Amino acid sequence: LKNFISNSDKLGFVGIFYMLFVYIMFFKDYDYIVNKIHQTTRREIYKSFFIYTIFFIVFPAIFIVLNLLLSFYDSNLFKKILLFLFTWLIFFALFKVSVNKIISTKAAFISSFLTLTTLSITKNLFIYYVVYNKTYTTIYGSLSTLLFSILWIYISWIIYLYGIKICHKLNMKYLNQVV
């Protein structure tokens, strides 16, 4: 992290412009995919930019405060539970706010919990596989780290998008019960 921060001043105008471009394009695509899953229209680009910029600023700030508060506690179990709850809050907020229509709180609550639980279990299984399977490290060397990182990003996004799909199905179910 120190190296990243110390190198950030070397980006220059073009680098900062490129990072901003990638940020906007990522959230534009994310907004398109999430709204397509929920079968609704997309937001205007400036509204999406505003919403995701708030996420990008507020949640890391809350995470820093949470880590500072957790540094005063010795209990690992308490820390793990609190971090799980905080991550659940992030998923809940993303599931609730990302879509350009009203999402049932119950649907977002259940689907975000299922998604986070699946992601946590898969993460532990993936770590176990990477640590104990030495074949890839032997064949590919340090390049295997890059391969596993890309594979993990792919798997985690599949899980996240299926969580969004579960949220859509539950939302349709709960909204039909209200009507």
Where are these regions (language model features)?
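Membrane-embedded alpha-helices and immediately adjacent juxtamembrane helical segments
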Residues: 1-179
